[in-house]
């Protein structure tokens, strides 16, 4: 049995910071692509400082700050700057104050390509070879080979009388002596077989 698992590609996460208004995030999982576009406001340093200084400490929330983690350091979103347009940061002026170079806006590319190949095959070969001598059964072992019964008559002209015949089955038999010798021998063989059993 062989089991092989092949992972062709591990998850790879790449992030680059660009100064662009729109960012496309594409997630690829097993050949399926999901794309979405989100609008971001450029992180102009001077405008950001003015905006943060114009707000009180109680009004500053998590949406007003950016993380130092390059994977999650997005620019300030539009809903974070709509509250104070006098600070110089707005959706209309953000495109003009933004340079055309592709630096500053977050772009996160997360691609997951995973191939799993499981091959389980069970190859079994069973070979049974039996070579044994043919053993004789107990009956064959106990069987005795008896000598061949042969009886010769002294006189071939002897005719069996009806009184000596077995139920009249051997009438006028000229081999009476041979017949009686054969019958006596058969009785002995039958008695010996009974004793052996």
From Swiss-Prot:
GO terms for cellular component: host cell cytoplasm. Belongs to the rotavirus NSP5 family. O-glycosylated. GO terms for molecular function: ATP hydrolysis activity; magnesium ion binding; nucleotide binding; RNA binding. The lineage of its organism: Viruses, Riboviria, Orthornavirae, Duplornaviricota, Resentoviricetes. It holds the Pfam family Rota_NS26. Mg(2+) binds at residue 92. Residues 130-167 are annotated as: Disordered. Plays an essential role in the viral genome replication. Participates, together with NSP2, in the formation of viral factories (viroplasms), which are large inclusions in the host cytoplasm where replication intermediates are assembled and viral RNA replication takes place. Orchestrates the recruitment of viroplasmic proteins such as capsid proteins to these factories. Participates in the selective exclusion of host proteins from stress granules (SG) and P bodies (PB). Also participates in the sequestration of these remodeled organelles in viral factories. The keyword DNA-binding does not apply. The modification Phosphoserine is found at residues 67, 153, 155, 163, 165. One of its GO terms (biological process) is viral genome replication. It is found in: Host cytoplasm. Residues 152-165 have a biased composition (Acidic residues). Residues 131-146 have a biased composition (Basic residues). InterPro entries: Rotavirus_A/C_NSP5. Keywords: Glycoprotein, Host cytoplasm, Magnesium, Metal-binding, Nucleotide-binding, Phosphoprotein, RNA-binding. Homodimer. Interacts with VP1. Interacts with VP2. Interacts with NSP2; this interaction leads to up-regulation of NSP5 hyperphosphorylation and formation of virus factories. Interacts with NSP6. Participates in the selective exclusion of host proteins from stress granules (SG) and P bodies (PB). Also participates in the sequestration of these remodeled organelles in viral factories. Its cofactor is Mg(2+). This is Non-structural protein 5.
């Amino acid at each position: 049995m062989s089991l092989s698992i092949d992972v062709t590609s591990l998850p790879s996460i790449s992030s680059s910071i660009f100064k662009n208004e729109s960012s496309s995030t594409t997630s690829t999982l097993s050949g399926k692509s999901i794309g979405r576009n989100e609008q971001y406001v450029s992180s102009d340093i001077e405008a950001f400082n003015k905006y943060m200084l114009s707000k009180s400490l109680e009004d500053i929330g998590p949406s007003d700050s950016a993380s130092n983690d390059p994977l999650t350091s997005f620019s300030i979103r539009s809903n974070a700057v709509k509250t104070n347009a006098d600070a110089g940061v707005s959706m209309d002026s953000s495109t003009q104050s933004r340079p055309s170079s592709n630096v500053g806006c977050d772009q996160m590319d997360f691609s997951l390509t995973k191939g799993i190949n499981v091959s389980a095959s069970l190859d079994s070969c069973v070979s049974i070879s039996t070579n044994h001598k043919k053993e004789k059964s107990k009956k064959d072992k106990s069987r005795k080979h008896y000598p061949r019964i042969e009886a010769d008559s002294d006189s071939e002209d002897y005719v069996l009388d009806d009184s000596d015949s077995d139920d009249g089955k051997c009438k006028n038999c000229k081999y009476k002596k041979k017949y009686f010798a054969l019958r006596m021998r058969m009785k002995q063989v039958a008695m010996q077989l009974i004793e052996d059993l």
